[in-house]
């Protein structure tokens, strides 16, 4: 019975959309004077529209790009303060919403593997784009985004840096560390 309830809770979090809620205040680029925002859409392997934006202040560091990976339950706007700090440090920052989140397409988030597939699609699109082909690309991710950030090097070994904030690299290991007794796999 307990395991069934846990499975239901997991499925309700993973197999649904994660859209804005009035319970959470989301900052926008307009809340930071001088922060520039430019739309850049990526088509996922599954055909979903991944809506993202480049954020920067005038004259960012040449050929340096940080891709920001958001956590579960929010889109990238839940991290606008962190994105702004990176932009203020002189970086061009690309932040997007995963499949099934906020401004991106998809009926459901699709779980942990979907975030990794989305990041692969984004990095592939950036690496193929004429303007960003010669950029040093780094990835910063939090929680769910930290999972994809830690695992993306297996697919894109040429990334300059990866930084995971409260991330985990193995779903099985994460579950075994945080659940005990009957709940332990």
Language-model segments: which ranges?
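Alpha/beta-hydrolase fold nucleophile elbow
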Residues: 131-143
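Hydrolase active-site cap/lid region
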Residues: 151-185
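Alpha/beta-hydrolase active-site loop
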Residues: 109-130
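The serine-hydrolase catalytic nucleophile loop
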Residues: 72-85, 98
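An N-terminal hydrophobic leader/cap segment in hydrolases
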Residues: 1-43, 51-53
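Short beta-strand element of the alpha/beta-hydrolase
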Residues: 62-71
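Conserved alpha/beta-hydrolase
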Residues: 86-105
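Glycine-rich nucleophile elbow surrounding the catalytic serine of serine-hydrolase chemistry
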Residues: 141-151
